[in-house]
């Protein structure tokens, strides 16, 4: 009967662990590099800054559309017009006078990209038509699995995540709201997107 000596087991275990660590480190390094390559933007709001990483590989059309609007200063001066605690904070459509800013065009739905509506992610708002998203987006303030694509049915396209400024997101979420211009969840004191800039 052959036996494996204890020091041999130890050596093999160390080698296996080293190889595994190398694989994990390489994978983590790849993810870090990919994250560093992702475009980032800063939402300068009247309550503070929110820095966002955009998932260009998973949602290329959505990110391209969003960055185009950023470069056109489309979002400057708009408000968070829909604030629902425990759900979402939404912007991209109305100014302080509740005047609707007409979007330039729609973007195709990319909700089957594997990204989920989790707390801290950004996703596109839309109507019942899956391809009706344009400029309005929201930040999830909770995990909202019911907004994900499921069973072949399209959901709401996730295209980014907050990397800094979740305290500002929470402050917006907890703002006192009212009904205004036929909409619920409008902050009593306007919370303005003063600028959106690339980082």
Region spans (language model):
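Cyclophilin-like peptidyl-prolyl cis-trans isomerases
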Residues: 2-5, 10, 22-199
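Hydrophobic helical h-region of N-terminal Sec-dependent signal peptides
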Residues: 15-21
């Amino acid at each position: 009967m052959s036996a494996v000596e204890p020091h041999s087991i130890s050596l093999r275990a160390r080698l296996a662990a080293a190889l595994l660590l190398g694989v994990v480190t390489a994978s983590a390094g790849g993810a870090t590099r990919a994250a560093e390559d992702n475009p980032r933007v800063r939402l300068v709001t009247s309550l503070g800054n929110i820095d966002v990483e955009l998932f260009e590989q998973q949602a290329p059309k959505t990110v391209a559309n969003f960055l185009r609007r950023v470069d056109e200063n489309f979002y400057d001066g708009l408000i968070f017009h829909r604030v629902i605690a425990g759900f979402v904070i939404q912007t991209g459509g109305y100014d302080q006078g509740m005047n609707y800013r007409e979007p330039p065009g729609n973007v195709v739905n990319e909700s089957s990209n594997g990204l989920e509506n989790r707390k801290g992610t950004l996703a596109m708002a839309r109507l019942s038509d899956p391809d009706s998203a344009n400029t309005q987006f929201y930040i999830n303030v909770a995990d909202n699995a019911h907004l994900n694509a499921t069973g072949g049915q399209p959901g709401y396209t996730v295209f980014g995540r907050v990397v800094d400024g979740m305290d500002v997101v929470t402050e917006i979420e907890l703002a006192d709201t009212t009904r205004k211009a036929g909409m619920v969840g409008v902050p009593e004191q306007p919370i303005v997107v003063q600028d959106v800039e690339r980082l």
